[in-house]
Amino acid sequence: MASTEIMTINMGPQHPSTHGVLRLIVELDGEIIQKVTPHIGYLHRGIEKLSEHRTYHQTIPLTDRLDYLAPMSNNLGYVLAVEKLLGIDVPERAQVIRVIMAELTRLKSHLVWIACHALDIGAMTVFLYAFRERENIMDIYEMVSGARMTSNFFRVGGLSKDIPEGFTAAVREVLDTFPGHFDTYEGLLTKNTIWLQRTIGNGVISAEDAIDYGITGPALRGSGVDWDLRRDNPYSGYEKYDFKVPVGENCDTFDRYKVRLVEMRESVKIIRQALDSLKPGPVLADEPQICYPPKENVYNSIEGLIHHFKIASEGFSTPEGEVYQSVEAPKGELGYYLVSDGSTKPYRMRIRPPSFVNLQAIEKMAKGAMIADLVAVIGTLDIVLGEIDR
């Protein structure tokens, strides 16, 4: 039998299907993948180190730039960690609004995932539809925070401001359209022969291997592991909401696709419950040493102006200690480990980004597949390089 020679090719760091500046060194035997080695770091900005030289409030805008497709989920994990360190409680209204925005963020992120994943495999129509729907959520983002992507909306102790008039009506109007849109996506993909051929049996990783690799989020649930932090380690009042956690059976790309579709429907359900439970009240904790004063106080009294200036310039001190806080971000478990030395700045902040951990499983998932199927494996992991490189 004739011997074969292993061919090594570079995929990226500038390749449309890698969803960012990711370089993959792929070893091939013909068209069969023998090994995939990811090379990262092209988007490294030193966010963890930068946080050591900024006050706790000044670090919030840095978290926007981790998974830039899900900025409010990044904000949420960070402010929860600082609040745990301080031992303060957040008003009920602020918690409900946080849940609403976190689930809208999940919808927004999953819409980008299904759009790009479908486009990678050749389904362009879904790409156009999903980005059209995402635009409606971006409008809500702009309504509440003034920004479409880097929102900087959450604060230690609550929110930067209350939701504007007309917010709940705008959200309900958008939610009413989603069930029909999800049906459209399923109609275009779920029984599409080409889609089934490219996803069923592709990127298989067993539940045991997924746990060993530390995979979280839809990629873990697609392997049949019933684990979701919102239900199993709840935060921000998630224990009050009724929702289902979907899990897969066959541990492949198609199952991960089905899991995310169901997750989007469940997010709509959670947001509706949150809107129904929204009551009047403050959106910032009554902690003058930590939280910014109301804007009307800043504009109309010298005391309010001095109060604002002091917190903005000096920050607030935290007790010595360390905490770890994780949230169920759209891509998996996003964790913040904070170490405080009692000053106004973190002594150390370590971020556990889900994409960074999930990416390491790509060799296991792609080995033995055709080179043409590698783009489907990348898409099913739903990585973003902003949080991988940090």
Swiss-Prot record:
Catalytic activity: a quinone + NADH + 5 H(+)(in) = a quinol + NAD(+) + 4 H(+)(out)
TM region positions: none
Record's keyword terms, sorted: Cell inner membrane, Cell membrane, Membrane, NAD, Quinone, Translocase, Transport, Ubiquinone
EC number(s) per entry: 7.1.1.-
Membrane topology, from the record: Peripheral membrane protein
Subcellular location: Cell inner membrane
Tree of life domain: Bacteria
Top-level class of the enzyme under EC nomenclature: translocase
Gene3D superfamilies in the record: Cytochrome-c3 Hydrogenase, chain B
GO molecular function annotations of the record: NAD binding; NADH:ubiquinone reductase (non-electrogenic) activity; quinone binding
Gene Ontology CC: plasma membrane
InterPro entries attached to this UniProt entry: NADH_Q_OxRdtase_suD, NADH_UbQ_OxRdtase_49kDa_CS, NDH1_su_D/H, NiFe-Hase_large
One Pfam family from the record: Complex1_49kDa
Free-text function comment from the UniProt entry: NDH-1 shuttles electrons from NADH, via FMN and iron-sulfur (Fe-S) centers, to quinones in the respiratory chain. The immediate electron acceptor for the enzyme in this species is believed to be ubiquinone. Couples the redox reaction to proton translocation (for every two electrons transferred, four hydrogen ions are translocated across the cytoplasmic membrane), and thus conserves the redox energy in a proton gradient.
Family under the similarity heading: Belongs to the complex I 49 kDa subunit family.
Subunit and interaction comment: NDH-1 is composed of 14 different subunits. Subunits NuoB, C, D, E, F, and G constitute the peripheral sector of the complex.
The protein's name: NADH-quinone oxidoreductase subunit D
Organism: Geotalea uraniireducens (strain Rf4) (Geobacter uraniireducens)
Primary gene name: nuoD
